[in-house]
From Swiss-Prot:
Superkingdom classification of source: Eukaryota
Membrane topology of this protein: Single-pass type I membrane protein
Biological role: May act as an auxiliary subunit of the unc-2 voltage-gated calcium channel which appears to trigger calcium-activated signaling pathways that control the serotonin response. Inhibiting serotonin sensitivity of the vulval muscles results in egg laying defects. May act in both neurons and muscle cells to enhance motor activity as it is required for coordinated movement. Has a role in neural depolarization-induced calcium influx and pharyngeal pumping. Involved in restricting the expression of the putative olfactory receptor str-2 to only one of the two AWC neurons.
Organism of derivation: Caenorhabditis elegans
Glycosylated residues in this chain: N100, N140, N146, N302, N520, N558, N757, N838, N903, N923, N1130
Gene Ontology terms describing biological process: egg-laying behavior; locomotion; nematode pharyngeal pumping; positive regulation of locomotion; protein localization to synapse; regulation of calcium ion transport; serotonin receptor signaling pathway
Statement: the UniProt record of this protein carries the keyword Membrane: yes
Protein name per UniProt: Voltage-dependent calcium channel unc-36
Cytoplasmic-side positions: 1249
Species lineage: Eukaryota, Metazoa, Ecdysozoa, Nematoda, Chromadorea
Span of domain VWFA: 250-479
Annotated keywords: Calcium, Calcium channel, Calcium transport, Glycoprotein, Ion channel, Ion transport, Membrane, Signal, Transmembrane, Transmembrane helix, Transport, Voltage-gated channel
Effect of disrupting the coding gene: Worms exhibit a weak egg-laying constitutive (Egl-c) phenotype and slow irregular pharyngeal pumping.
Length: 1249
């Protein structure tokens, strides 16, 4: 009972409480500090831990450059093996030939082709007869996938029976040419051999130019919408396919916005633009031009800044701007084409366009500046000599290193082919021109076809929305021909992507058995099943954050490009080759791709915590957007002991120097230049962005050969120490099973220690390691499957040995822990091992005793409605050791016991009459934690901590001058960021806190009320806290929705229309595929919501910087306050403008050795209504604001940073891409649609209207 506990607390402090003045905040804080340090010392056994470690390890100051090189070589070896597997698949495919059987669709023939469908999960199919009857034949399956959880695929269910084949929705899966290519690509034997050689080999892929994708091992398909079986995926739009299939390119999209581009045409044009953008990778650059009577480039600088890198951030930004333009007037090609070439080629000099009437009215010397004149049908183009020379020399230097220049023209027709313009700008045909004629009734084919055919391009007719996806890929096929012809030039050159979220790893919806009748006896089974489901969801959540890079090779057969062979590599595996256990606890590795964008970084937050989608800018973040500046001081060069401030030409503070800083740091890292390392003062943020910690980093970098990545290392000041084993060679024969016999230890769930067999999903990571440990003990050497991670395994064994007697030590403190309501102690190590000790408190239940199963009939197996239980701080909530929030906090506050409160867990009182520490009858208590980093001098050994019932805090504070009471004397404990750890307001509710509606606890102190706001300002003014400003460059903002109204009486029937039109579109596409024709007509009703994959998610948000102030404890600062009084002379403060009677005195004192600050606010005797918001409201002009707000910058035209990709070292020449057989055909021609299709469409059209 809580009364008994309180008596124990009173007895414990009987000698102490009589020896200090409870009216003195300084003495109260001092005694509280001594108590907390004594308690932590007894629980952590810090002295014993250090003694244990000193027998096994020694401290070492490591060389960052040497450690970085070791990690670099490990990563290179790892990536090289994956690259070889992809190359092996390429060679195997190129040695095969495509069959030419004519009976591949005849189930009675031996040549009948089956394949394992990714969407169906078997090899069954439906064949549609290619005749006027349109009959279909159902072919039953002979094989199906038996998907089982795979231990080496992060428990994702896979099948090794065969590879799976995915076919995009617009393609007919029984097209004979498609089937022959699917059969040709069946190299499962190669895939299987590769997989057997390397346990942690991820998905092996092949994407065909025909559109299908084969992947091994098979896994169920991830639908974009599971309920509707919506599938937007096409492997030909992936970065790994685009990189290998085409040269890198500079692309200018010209979008006709003339008056005829209205309604359906414009919607098709927008969809075509999206589809083109979908095919651009980070190695490409682009801009979009709208033209009618005027021309506009959609970037913020109207083209003066040239082309933008094709990041998703830039693509979505320009796509949004398209919606702000309307169709009007005439399409002025004579204005648009010269501007397009000027921007695309970055031409120097100038030109002007005059009408013929304007030219005739000018004087003879009016155009002396322009020495060149070209007469066009409606204008005269006048240009300077510099401009003409620039054209003849191939343009300026703004092509950013891309290989090809491309114009994409989207129009419903052109009045002229403008041969003179193309002859002037593109005489050598170095610029490809692709034309997309949109609209089902478009008839002006000849002019746009001539533009494409005369300029190494291709023309397609995009009749309607159903046409878009497949028609777009004609341009890629056209550009891939040079890859086929010149493939020998690249040799064994591999292509690597940046980071992306692999859809094959994404969690699929779980399917559960039908509910069974609920009985009194079934609730235990129900709870157990709910617990297992919780574990499965945790694992699937981990997979949802699976990001990969992919290595790929083009597959060429007889100089014909056939597709791309690839292997993807989870970045969590790559990161373990540069393991955090090898460096200091505050230091970290990071990796950049060939474009300089961040791939891995502890501050990268790629997933939006609310939508669970990846952010638009997740794979195009610059390093300095994550290394957020701490203050105005920017340091450079460590060659001398005195670190000098960086002085910029533009100024001397951070804001003015940011551009110079970006160039200096980024150039050093991209160039892998460690000769003059850079140092920055930065803010390290926790994952939830509720805490930031200042630290000074020194940066080092190494280039990863072949992949063109950059591996970086940020070493925090004073953090270049680690522990290493005393033995040069670890003796595995000394491994004892007793070290792990108690089962109260856990390993990092995302780190591999030893490889497993695919089928070892029935055992936990800990159980598997015990088996390997037994083999070590028996044989005296490391098992083969542990050799790959030997260094980490040795560190783990050292931690296990050093902490093996902790359980016994914790046993000796059983009574002490019980009396102080401590029910959990733990120690987390850099090797990822956490050892813990559980103690069940007698007066508390760990499963909700007030829950009744009969209240939740119908919710069987639902976590939310299963009987609630205690969420274990380690086994349920914090399994990741060094990656967990508490660990990262502890190592950044050396020699400090950190106190925190958690709303993720609770325990229940056994007695229904027991009251909380605040005197409320709520049946439960929340939990608090204390933790601290343990050091062997300067090197971290781990983080020790314990968890306790929060009632103990309330009772302890009552004995240190702060009993729960009214607001006459308000006592609070603030943590290092001024969040409230304890408040003595007597109406604080645990239940409210646990559902996010609590009062005071865990809230920012300065935002509670006007009194707290003023007190917080004084805490900053008196140097208890330092004000910091953090900019979140990864934030997202909600886009303002444009609301439109319509009086259309048919609007309620739109869902029906949508279904009918989708059904009709499918039938026509199917008939078109079977007949080999092309779709050129559909009724005019189209529902034009974006369905292109990359533009399907997150359309209501956009990337934006957000900024917030933070307040960091100055307990170790140089200007630590010398008095406890927040107002000079301990005078009263009157913070309420509307209430002159409110008068308070404010005091504060650090609780030494902890992260806490004790604050007392005492009302004078005559003081009234200080906490009544109607009489004492918060100040609008807040001196201590807190909370993220969007940084509203005026839109200015700033030059984009020029990024030259390291991936563009090889460019295939297009000079010979001009032969007759290559140029003809250079377009798709419309074919007559069957009478049946037209009649059916007209019938449906008139039925609707």
């Amino acid at each position: 009972m809580r009364v008994v506990h309180l008596l124990v607390v009173l007895a414990t402090y009987v000698s102490t409480t009589s020896s200090f003045n409870k009216e003195s905040i300084k003495e109260c804080a001092k005694v509280l500090s001594e108590h907390m340090k004594e308690t932590f010392s007894k629980i952590s056994h810090e002295t014993i831990l250090k003694q244990n470690y000193e027998k096994l390890v020694e401290e070492e100051q490591f060389d960052p450059r040497a450690e970085l090189k070791k990690s670099k070589h490990r990563i290179e070896d790892y990536l090289k093996v994956r690259s070889q597997f992809a190359y092996k698949a390429k060679i195997s495919l190129e040695a095969r030939s495509v069959r030419n059987d004519s009976t591949v669709n005849d189930p009675q023939s031996k040549s009948f082709i089956r394949f394992m469908s990714a969407k169906q999960g078997n090899d069954g199919t439906t064949i549609y007869e290619s005749n006027h009857l349109g009959k279909r034949l159902k072919v039953n399956e002979t094989k199906s996938f038996n998907l089982t959880q795979n231990a080496n695929f992060y428990t994702l269910p896979t099948s090794s029976v065969s590879s799976a084949v995915h076919i995009p929705t617009p393609l007919y899966d029984r097209n004979e040419d498609l089937l022959r290519k699917i059969d040709w690509s069946d190299i499962d034997a190669v895939y299987r051999t590769n997989r057997e050689e390397t346990k942690d080999l991820a998905f092996q892929l092949f994407c065909s130019e025909a559109g299908y994708m084969r992947y091994y091992p098979a896994a169920s398909w991830f639908w974009d919408n599971q309920d509707e079986h919506l599938d937007l995926f096409d492997c030909r739009n992936t970065e790994w396919y685009i990189n290998s299939a085409t040269n890198s390119k500079n692309v200018l999209i010209m979008l006709d916005m003339s008056g005829s581009m209205l309604g359906q045409r414009y919607e098709v044009a927008k969809q075509t633009t999206e589809a083109i953008l979908e095919t651009l990778s980070h190695n490409d650059y682009f801009n979009i031009m709208t033209f009618s009577k005027n021309t506009f480039l959609l970037d913020g600088c109207n083209g003066t800044n040239g082309l933008l890198q094709a990041t998703m951030r830039n693509k979505k930004a320009l796509r949004r701007k398209m919606d702000t333009y309307q169709s009007e007037g005439k399409a002025e090609y004579e204005k648009a084409l010269p501007l397009a070439f000027s921007v695309l080629l970055d031409l120097k000099g100038s030109y002007a366009l005059y009408t013929k009437e304007e030219m005739s009215m000018m004087s003879a010397n009016a155009t002396n500046e322009y020495q060149f004149h070209l007469e066009l049908p409606e204008h005269v183009l006048a240009a300077t000599k510099q401009y003409i020379d620039s054209i003849n020399n191939g343009g300026g230097d703004n092509n950013r290193g891309a290989c090809e220049n491309v114009i994409m023209l989207i129009t419903d027709g052109a009045p002229n082919a403008y041969k003179k313009i193309f002859d002037m700008y593109n005489a050598d045909k170095k610029v490809r021109v692709f034309t997309f004629l949109v609209g089902d009734e478009a008839i002006d084919f000849n002019e746009v076809r001539e533009m494409a055919c005369n300029n190494r391009g291709y023309m397609v007719h995009v009749a309607n929305m159903a046409d878009v996806d497949e028609k777009i890929h004609h341009y890629i096929r056209r550009m891939s021909r040079v890859v086929g012809r010149h493939y020998k030039e690249s040799g064994q050159l591999s292509w690597w992507t940046g980071v992306y979220r692999e859809r094959l790893y994404l969690p699929r919806p779980e399917i559960f058995a039908e509910p069974v009748p609920i009985t009194n006896q079934s609730f235990a089974v129900m709870n157990k099943m709910a617990s297992r489901r919780k574990i499965r969801l945790q694992k699937s959540e981990a997979r949802s954050r699976m990001f990969v890079t992919t290595v790929s090779y083009p597959v060429i057969v007889n100089e014909t490009f056939m597709g791309v062979a690839a292997v993807n590599i989870p970045l969590t595996e790559v990161a373990q080759k540069s393991h955090p256990a090898n460096i200091g606890s505050k230091s970290y590795f990071f990796m950049l791709d060939q474009n300089g964008f961040v791939m891995t970084h502890p501050q990268l937050r790629p997933i939006d915590p609310f939508t669970k989608y990846h952010k638009q800018n997740y794979n195009n973040m610059d390093l300095l957007e994550l290394e957020v500046g701490q203050n105005q001081n920017v340091r450079s060069s460590q060659k001398s002991q005195a670190v000098s401030d960086l002085v910029c030409e533009s100024g001397a503070n951070y804001a003015e120097c940011v551009d110079d800083l970006r160039k200096a740091v980024r150039k050093m890292i991209i160039d892998c230049d460690n000769s003059d390392v850079q140092q920055l003062d930065v803010l390290y943020a926790t994952e939830l962005l509720d805490r930031v910690y200042p630290q000074t980093n020194t940066y080092y970098a190494e280039c990863i050969n072949h992949a063109n990545f950059v591996l970086g290392l940020a070493v925090a000041k004073g953090d270049d120490y680690r522990v290493v084993k005393k033995q040069k060679k670890y003796d595995f024969g000394r491994v004892k099973m007793d070290w792990m016999g108690d089962k109260r230890w856990r390993l990092h769930p995302h780190w591999r220690y030893c490889f497993l067999n695919d089928t070892d999903t029935h055992m936990s990571k800990e159980e598997a390691f015990e088996i390997y440990a037994q083999q070590m003990s028996d044989s005296g050497k490391a098992p083969l499957l542990c050799e790959y991670r030997r260094n980490l395994v040795e560190k783990l064994l050292l931690d296990m040995e050093a902490t093996s007697n902790l359980i016994d030590s914790w046993d000796t403190q059983f009574n002490f822990m019980k009396n102080n309501l401590i029910h959990l102690a733990f120690f987390a190590t850099p090797s990822g091992m956490i050892r813990y000790y559980n103690l069940t408190l007698q007066d508390y239940d760990y499963i909700d005793p007030y829950w009744s199963i009969f209240e939740h009939i119908g919710h069987l197996l639902s976590i939310e409605h299963a009987q609630e239980s205690y969420n274990h701080f380690i086994t349920d909530l914090n399994r990741k050791s060094t990656d967990d929030r508490y660990y990262r906090r502890a190592v950044r506050m050396k020699d400090t016991i950190m106190f925190d409160v958690s709303n993720n867990s609770k325990i229940w009182y056994k007695s229904e009459t027991q009251l909380t520490g605040y005197g409320l009858n709520e049946n439960l208590t929340m939990l608090g934690q204390a933790f601290k980093a343990i050091y062997l001098d300067k090197a971290v050994l781990g983080v020790s901590g314990f968890e306790f019932a929060y009632d103990h805090v309330v009772d302890t504070m009552a004995e240190h001058g702060c009993p729960a009471s009214d607001d006459r004397k308000w006592c609070v404990l603030l943590d290092e960021h001024a969040y409230v750890f304890f408040s003595n307001q007597n109406d604080i509710s645990y239940e409210d806190y646990l559902v996010g509606k609590g009062k005071h606890i865990s809230q920012y102190f300065g935002g509670l009320n006007r009194i707290a706001q003023r007190a917080m300002a004084l805490l900053v003014e008196n140097k208890f806290y330092t004000k910091l400003t953090y900019t979140d460059n990864q934030a997202v903002c909600k886009a303002e929705k444009v609301v439109t109204t319509s009086g259309n009486r048919l609007r309620p029937f739109y869902p029906i229309f949508r279904f009918l039109m989708q059904t009709f579109n499918f039938m026509v596409r199917l008939a078109s595929q079977i007949s080999g024709g092309f779709l050129i007509w559909l009724p005019n009703i189209q529902f034009t919501e974006a369905y292109t994959a990359s533009f399907h998610e997150g359309t209501d948000v956009y990337p934006c910087p957000k900024q917030s102030s933070f307040y960091f404890s100055n307990k170790d600062g140089k200007n630590r306050p010398g008095t406890t009084h927040l107002v000079n002379g301990n005078r009263s403060e009157r913070p309420c403008k509307m209430n002159a009677k409110c008068s308070v005195k404010m005091e504060a004192s650090f609780v030494d050795g902890t992260n806490l600050v004790m604050v007392w606010i005492t009302q004078d005797k005559a003081s009234e209504n200080c906490y009544d918001e109607s009489e004492c409201s918060m100040e609008i002009s807040n001196q201590v604001p807190f909370g993220f707000e969007e940084v509203k910058n005026e839109e200015t035209c700033e030059e984009n940073e020029k990024r030259k990709s390291k991936a563009n070292d090889v460019c295939y020449s297009i000079d010979d891409d001009d032969s007759e057989n290559e140029r003809r055909p250079c377009s798709t021609s419309p074919t007559i649609v069957s009478i049946f299709q037209i009649l059916f469409g007209v019938f449906l059209h008139f039925c609707i209207f």
